[in-house]
């Protein structure tokens, strides 16, 4: 099992190109199931989760060609409507095949999902919405089985804002008979990116980017070409890395407008951030100021940046509160940050972070995707060497992170378990 070894204390400088968004690429790959014609994608990140999704789609009969950030998918010969436990357990986003399969083929059998162990994240909103559209759904032996001759348009009000739920129901609705209205829809840019691809495939969707999506169902979708949006969480992670380690870095292929909640807090911490249409420059030459924040749905501060910003707060002047409102059990990185010398206490869904002048390198363990990123950020600032175990979590969501950091001047190397 690979590990990362990071020697702290080196400021970052140079340029980094932000990869395509994982959380946009995964539903967009699933959307290829909605058409018998080819879908051509660009700016697809090379991540473990993407490879897992492509493997799942391939097992279903989708013909796939991929390389150099491009993926072409042809779902004209799909012959397997099952997403097995072996695939789904490693990646929760596998649930996103449910809506497209039921909408186009009238049947799907999908194992209950896994992924990061950060809370229950139930799929009941997906099921409730599909049932409102006329699907018959049973759950037994660990599988969700859904059947429908043709889905019918419906008004769906989700009990909570759910990103994957919105995406699944949106993909189901585009081939349903009549009008579907999704109220309380997630407004995340990745949902909007999926919607733009669906429109390019012939779907009729109004309200993209709002919490009310109105879909007029069509009989079939055609092929399309689409470029995946930049990954705002990868961009935010690099911004926090520079803020912690110090330095002067320019990010390319980024959308500053979808990062405003993060950049606002970085400026509050004393970081200098400049931005253009598709670039950002971040500079830091001092110890950051502690920043209190709470996570919430887009456009508020993203839960996927909570751990990285907490790592920044560990070496800040002052004390900060971090309130996590989206997921329970998303403070698993706290124990590992404290091993590096951080001073963090937890009370329910709130973490109290008292900044320290210096962290010290130690052996730590990644517990989930964003937690692993927080440990990398802390290690860049720590005195001495930090060894991060279980970095397969990092590989699920970051495209060549150690390569990009090394190019910026960080001392990072990947070692196999036998070398560590």
Curated annotation (Swiss-Prot):
Active-site residue list: 116
CDD domains: UdpNAET
Similarity field: Belongs to the EPSP synthase family. MurA subfamily.
A molecular function GO annotation: UDP-N-acetylglucosamine 1-carboxyvinyltransferase activity
UniProt-annotated binding residues for phosphoenolpyruvate: 22-23
Location of 2-(S-cysteinyl)pyruvic acid O-phosphothioketal modifications: 116
Biological-process GO terms, alphabetical: cell division; cell wall organization; peptidoglycan biosynthetic process; regulation of cell shape; UDP-N-acetylgalactosamine biosynthetic process
Ligand binding (UDP-N-acetyl-alpha-D-glucosamine): 92, 121-125, 304, 326
Catalytic reaction annotation: phosphoenolpyruvate + UDP-N-acetyl-alpha-D-glucosamine = UDP-N-acetyl-3-O-(1-carboxyvinyl)-alpha-D-glucosamine + phosphate
Upper classification of the organism: Bacteria, Pseudomonadati, Pseudomonadota, Betaproteobacteria, Burkholderiales
Superkingdom per UniProt: Bacteria
Keywords of the record: Cell cycle, Cell division, Cell shape, Cell wall biogenesis/degradation, Cytoplasm, Peptidoglycan synthesis, Pyruvate, Transferase
The protein's name in its UniProt record: UDP-N-acetylglucosamine 1-carboxyvinyltransferase
Coiled coil: none
Location within or outside the cell: Cytoplasm
Protein's job: Cell wall formation. Adds enolpyruvyl to UDP-N-acetylglucosamine.
GO CC list: cytoplasm
Pathway the protein contributes to: Cell wall biogenesis; peptidoglycan biosynthesis
EC number(s) recorded for this UniProt protein: 2.5.1.7
Family matches, as SUPFAM superfamilies: EPT/RTPC-like (SSF55205)
InterPro entries in alphabetical order: Enolpyruvate_Tfrase_dom, Enolpyruvate_Tfrase_sf, MurA_subfamily, RNA3'P_cycl/enolpyr_Trfase_a/b, UDP_GlcNAc_COvinyl_MurA
Main location: cytoplasm
């Amino acid at each position: 099992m690979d590990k990362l070894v990071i020697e702290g204390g080196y400021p970052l400088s140079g340029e980094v190109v932000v990869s395509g968004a994982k959380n946009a690429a995964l539903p967009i790959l699933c959307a290829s199931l909605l058409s018998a014609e080819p879908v051509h994608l660009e700016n697809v990140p090379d991540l473990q989760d993407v490879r897992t999704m492509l493997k799942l789609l391939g097992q279903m009969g989708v013909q796939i060609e991929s390389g150099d950030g491009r993926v072409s998918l042809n779902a004209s010969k799909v012959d397997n409507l099952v997403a097995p436990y072996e695939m789904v357990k490693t990646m929760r986003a596998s649930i996103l095949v449910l809506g497209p399969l039921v909408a186009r083929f009238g049947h799907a059998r999908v194992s209950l999902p896994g992924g990061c162990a950060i809370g229950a994240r139930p799929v009941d909103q997906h099921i409730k919405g599909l049932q409102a559209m006329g699907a018959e759904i049973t759950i037994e032996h660990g599988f969700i089985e859904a059947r429908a001759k043709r889905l019918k348009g419906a008004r769906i009000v989700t009990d909570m804002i759910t990103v994957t739920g919105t995406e699944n129901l949106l993909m189901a609705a585009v081939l349903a008979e009549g009008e579907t209205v999704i109220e309380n829809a997630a407004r995340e840019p990745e949902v909007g990116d999926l919607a733009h691809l669906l429109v390019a495939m012939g779907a009729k969707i109004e309200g993209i980017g709002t919490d009310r999506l109105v879909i007029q169902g069509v009989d079939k979708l055609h092929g399309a070409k689409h470029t995946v949006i930049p990954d705002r969480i990868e961009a935010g992670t690099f911004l926090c890395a520079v803020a912690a380690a110090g330095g002067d870095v320019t990010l390319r292929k980024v959308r500053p407008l979808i990062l405003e909640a993060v950049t606002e807090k970085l400026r509050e911490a004393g970081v200098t951030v400049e931005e253009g249409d598709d670039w950002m420059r971040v500079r830091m030459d001092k110890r950051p100021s502690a920043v209190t924040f709470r996570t919430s749905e887009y456009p508020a501060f993203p839960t996927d940046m909570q751990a990285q910003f907490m790592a920044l707060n560990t070496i800040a002047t002052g004390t900060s509160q971090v309130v996590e409102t989206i997921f329970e059990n998303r403070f698993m990185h706290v124990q590992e940050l404290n091993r590096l010398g951080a001073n963090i206490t937890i009370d329910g869904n709130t973490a109290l972070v008292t900044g320290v002048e210096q962290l010290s390198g130690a052996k730590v363990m990644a517990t989930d995707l964003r937690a692993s990123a927080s440990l990398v950020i802390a290690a860049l600032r720590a005195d001495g060497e930090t060894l991060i175990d279980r970095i397969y979590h990092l590989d699920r969501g970051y495209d060549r992170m150690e390569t990009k950091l090394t190019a910026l001047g960080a001392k990072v190397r990947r070692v196999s378990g036998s070398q560590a």
